[in-house]
């Protein structure tokens, strides 16, 4: 009988994968490690690391500046750049990023104030009044025409009555559609953008944005990673080529256990989430560099179908998820055995649940090794907090 393959794309010595026209974003973002304590040297150092440590060759191509670059507004309302953190402004930083063959990303808020101006200690109070509200057209022209950024993340702290001192309470859908119109008005058709509303915003987001946050902010703890995965298990209907559920920036390489790092990265890839590294690229802990440069897992994330994995079986606290790759309803599947519990699990799936029949060739994507040919059922042992793909 003809073999049907349960695997990711079978990769040759060189990495080649057909990408969707607008695959999930890959790159690095400043917030997880630096918060608002950023400057031009920090950003350039991360760009250098991305270009020289193998990340660019694996498809990572964005350097994103999150909150912390703001310097208030002048008397005419023009947005200013922080004079100490970026003494020469942002355009030289963007030009430097571009000179390395990378794309540059920036941050703003849908309301009047940024998140760092309200949350955390100490607060970055210079972010007060620097949000987009009342300045959509001029700020987008600044970011995309004058400063030549390629991506923007738009937060919502300053537009939610629960998260800003002014109790400004804007209509989420209307507000983000106004922002989408302002981006379009710049004339740039190569700009991508992210809605950051900390929960799935609604199907309207799928029509206007490239990605949208579906959960609260990630933080450096297994409980955070587990919570985000749990909230993402049943959102596959809302992902499509060019439009993705964003599970937030990666905490891989910052101190989770090896199994937790593998689950974190692997499940983000299964879900076709943007892959934005959050650690210092020059100080990656453990085996995380090799993990984040696993081209077989990256191929799963960047697969041209742009689909998100969905649950086919749940048992004893674990979940089995499947994802079509290369061809919808074809002969390849990527399957994740996800164990969020505190004990090891023996997990299995019948090939009939994956719409596969006959002999099935199996490959382990973490090990990057063929595991043989199976028929009927695949069983694996998965450690606590672990995943096998």
Model-derived segments and their meaning:
Residues 18-20:
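Boundary at the C-terminal end of the N-terminal hydrophobic targeting segment
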Residues 24-30, 59-66, 103-108, 150-155, ...:
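Structural recognition of the beta-strand scaffold that forms the well-ordered cores
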Residues 42, 46, 50-165:
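Aromatic-lined carbohydrate-binding/catalytic grooves of carbohydrate-active enzymes
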Residues 102-120, 183-202:
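Aromatic-lined carbohydrate-recognition surfaces of secreted/lumenal glycan-active proteins
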Residues 138, 189-280:
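Glycan-recognition surfaces
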Residues 263-312, 388-389:
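Catalytic cores of secreted or luminal carbohydrate-active enzymes
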Residues 268-271, 276-278, 314-356:
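Carbohydrate-binding surface patches
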Residues 373-389:
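C-terminal beta-strand-rich structural cap/linker in extracellular carbohydrate-active enzymes
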């Amino acid at each position: 009988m003809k073999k049907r393959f349960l695997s990711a794309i079978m990769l040759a010595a060189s990495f080649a994968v057909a990408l969707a026209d607008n695959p999930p974003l890959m790159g690095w973002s400043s917030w997880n490690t630096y918060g608002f304590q950023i400057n031009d040297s920090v950003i350039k150092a991360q760009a250098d690391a991305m270009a020289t440590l193998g990340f660019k060759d694996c498809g990572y191509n964005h350097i994103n500046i999150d909150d912390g670059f703001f310097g208030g507004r002048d008397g005419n309302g023009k947005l200013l750049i922080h004079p100490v953190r970026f003494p020469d402004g942002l355009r030289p930083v963007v030009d430097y990023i571009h000179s390395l063959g990378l794309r540059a990303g920036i941050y703003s808020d849908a309301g009047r104030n940024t998140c760092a101006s309200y949350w955390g200690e100490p607060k970055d109070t210079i972010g007060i009044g620097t949000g987009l509200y009342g300045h959509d057209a001029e700020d987008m022209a600044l970011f995309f025409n004058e400063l030549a950024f390629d991506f923007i993340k738009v937060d919502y702290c300053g537009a939610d009555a629960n998260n800003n001192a002014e109790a400004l309470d804007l209509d989420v859908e209307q507000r983000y559609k106004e922002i989408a119109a302002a981006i379009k008005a710049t004339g740039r058709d190569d700009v991508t953008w992210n809605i950051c509303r900390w929960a799935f915003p609604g199907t309207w987001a799928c029509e206007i944005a490239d990605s949208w946050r579906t959960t609260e902010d990630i933080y450096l703890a297994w409980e955070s990673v587990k919570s985000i995965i749990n909230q993402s298990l049943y959102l596959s209907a809302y992902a499509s080529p060019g439009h993705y559920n964003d599970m937030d920036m990666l905490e891989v390489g910052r101190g989770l256990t090896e199994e937790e790092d593998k689950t974190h990265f692997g499940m983000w890839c299964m879900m076709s989430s943007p892959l934005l590294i959050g650690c210092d690229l020059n100080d990656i802990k453990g085996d995380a560099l090799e993990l984040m440069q696993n081209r077989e897992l990256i191929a799963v994330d960047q697969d041209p179908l742009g689909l998100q994995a969905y649950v086919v079986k749940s048992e004893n606290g674990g979940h089995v998820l499947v994802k079509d790759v290369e061809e919808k309803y074809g002969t390849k599947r990527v399957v994740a055995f996800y164990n969020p519990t505190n004990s090891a699990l023996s997990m299995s799936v019948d090939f009939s649940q994956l719409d596969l029949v006959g002999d099935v060739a199996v490959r382990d994507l973490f090990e990057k090794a063929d595991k043989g040919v199976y028929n009927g059922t695949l069983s694996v042992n998965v450690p606590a907090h672990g995943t096998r793909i």
